[in-house]
Amino acid sequence: MLRRLLLLLVLLVGLSPTRAQAQSQPQPRRLSLSGQLRSGTEPVAGAVLALLQPADSSMLAYAITDSQGRYTLQLETALPELLLRVRSLGYRPQLRQIKAETQRLDLSLEREERLLREVLVKAQRLWAQRDTLNYLVSAYTLQQDRTIGDVLRRLPGITIEDKKVIKYQGVPINRFYIENLDLLRGRYNLATEGIKAEDVATVQVLEHHEPVRALQDQRPAQQAAINLRLKDKAKGVWSKALRLGAGAYAPGPLWDATLQASYFGKGRQQLLRYSSDNLGRDHDPAAVLYGAFVSEPTQLLELVAHGRPPVGNGLFGYRHGAHLSSLTKLADSASLSYQLHYRHQSTHGSSLTETSYLLPEGTRLQLTEDISDRTQRHATELQLSYEKNRAQSFVSSTLVLSGEWNEGRGELSSVSRRLPQAAGGTAEIGERLQALHHRTLRLNSRTRWVHRGAGGTGFEWSSTNSLSSSPQALVLEGSKLARQDLSLSTYASSNTLELLRKVETQRWTLSATAHLDARYTTLSSSLTHPDVPRGGRSELSHLHTRLALGPILRYSHGTLQGSLRLPLALGYTLLDNTPVAGERSDAQRLKLHLQPSLSLSWRLSDSYSLQAGASYSASETPWRQLLTATIMQSYRSLARYRAALHDSHAASAEARLSYRDLFSRIFAHIEAGWRRSWSDISYGTRLDEEGQRLLEAAYLPHHSERYTLTAYGRKDLDWQTTQLALSATLSRSEQELLRQGVRLHYRALGYGLQGSVGLDLTSGYRLEYDARWQGLRSELVEQRLWSGALAQRLQLSLALLNARLQAKLYAKHSHDSSLALGQRDFLFLGASLSYKPNRRLELILDGDNLSDIRSYATRRLEELEEYRSVYHLRPRSLVLSLRLTL
């Protein structure tokens, strides 16, 4: 691994000329050219200005004038002179030589009369200004679109996944602004599903976006941000919308209610939302949170619950949610915001699952479970934030208080047997009742301070602290009586100090960074279980601290940026378990690690950009895998580990090449990744004849390796407003697993293909089709398994009576070729009919699962297990809703 890192460093150094050459050549400098284009007294909008290299007329930068004819061109160059070319339809082109210096240049264009035959000039729908892409919303909006989220799904380069994650060129965004303000602080789906498409003028994608202005020259930004530019009619006014719906399905009545109010002013923004329904929606737009505090999960105990079907709707119950966001702009660069969020969800359901555990001797242990459960979940959060973002300084402070309360009860019956049958008998486990109680209270704070001096030097300091308490209990009744009580408390602090240097004036800069982290965890456990005679009470305390110091070497030349970090980390761990006879329960150690990382960003041209990185890390055994006491994690799972401190090592590398052509409207990227991990301790499972699992640790050096390759392409055509997208994935993994105390070698090859097409059949009639095919081949102890599934969706949208009457018809089909018995193909039908008599009122009739499919079967593979599940689905339903804009 060290040899590979040295090779990457040599390649990075080789991209730069020698120091003597750099001193003899002119140093590149940044210039800004701005002005206004006019023809007489009228501004010229949509004109293209390009800066060219005099030697070969190659393009260095370009810009497009706005509605007032204004433009701004920025460039870093060492040339003394440049060529400026100006072109616009209907005007005589210009080409002039200018000095390569910051200046204001107002230009006048002369009209040019040309005879054009049957030429239709449309408003420009997509244009770029440096690292900002601008999408004209009206050019991408269809008659059936209601929210800005409907339009975002159609914009080239932007995708919204099933879990509502917004991505640009396959990478999740890091900010979602509304008029350049971050009102929602990570709950960005409130905007995509709550802001009307007709209120947005332009969607901007800020490529390579660094939110902190004082750090924009320090590190290559990998993510993009989205900014919504609203129309004037939507600014400074309250926008209110109400939706009320009622309907029915076989189990009983249905309801749907949503109320939202928003205000987007110049110095103040607010959004309020309340929603409630029993339609089986598992998505809450306020629940998907970008960039949240990374807190360690506190729930150690789980209720074995019914599964969720990948196709169809298997969620029964209801939910309520309320959210309030408010932001006040104190000055041009300072803002104060707060958020209050609450959600409650009650669910119930049932499923039948058959799990086959692959065993070392080539046999299988098959566990069949009939599960039904009912859960209640409550969550609330209060967030206060202050931010001051200036060119030379940045201050941010956030305080979050959150709580969760989960209650669950379930019934299950299970049968286990050995396959082939001759290898063993059948064990009837009988009926069991399970109950889960879980509470969590968290307090998180984050402070960040960046300061830059006049010469560009400065520092960045950040501190993140968290305090949490989580009591929880799991109770089993029926054929086996058991009870597990836990009380978990954690305090964590992460602090970073980094020195900053100005990187624009020189290619190489050297700075330093320091980290001080600490985490203290205490756990109290009480277990009563017939299979664990040494249950009773037990305690754990775990302290881990880490001090890291190291240099940061940065390289910057034009559009090429890279950084090499070499932190040397000193870690100290102190572990204290309740004594166990004949075993070691306490441990402590001091360990030194070198954890280098390399990142590279290179904008090869206006169309191509490259990002790459490599890293090595070493992490110590987490406290969860140091418990010497037995913990009942679920009705079928017991965990007991050893107090052995060891390191897990990982090395990874990834590269990503992105392409975009605005004029041809082509967006594409290809990404490759590699990761290898190794450790001296293996964690595996030991199964008894009833399918009960004991999670254990053993000294067994092992490793795992994984390769991934992803490709994506998107093309838009003017013909019938056609959109084409295609993506492919390939993954290969090898790892060593522990089952029944035996090391097993596991291999897997996964692949997937996904495509979509959308086009207008005629005015008001649009057809959209997407399909996804996935396959997996695995090999274990001469057992070869294969699974494959196809899912496709077809939707026809119709707009009649000047779009006042709209209809949507859709069909979903799934095929699982790996199901040996039973039904392999399922077809789901749905429809929606809406009538809008005026701008404020809309009536909507929704029909779900019109084919009335009540059950759905799947098969999937996961390392040493094979799952076959039968899900119970919601039957046919009809809901009539009224949507009113107030």
Task: State what each model feature region is.
Residues 752-773, 783-886:
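Conserved C-terminal beta-signal and adjacent last beta-strands/turns
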Residues 572-577, 606-652, 674-691, 851-864, ...:
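Surface-exposed extracellular loop regions of Gram-negative outer-membrane beta-barrel proteins
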Residues 39-54, 79:
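Short, ordered, surface-exposed loop/turn motifs in non-cytosolic proteins
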Residues 331-345, 375-417, 425-578, 603, ...:
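Face-selective signature of the C-terminal outer-membrane beta-barrel domain
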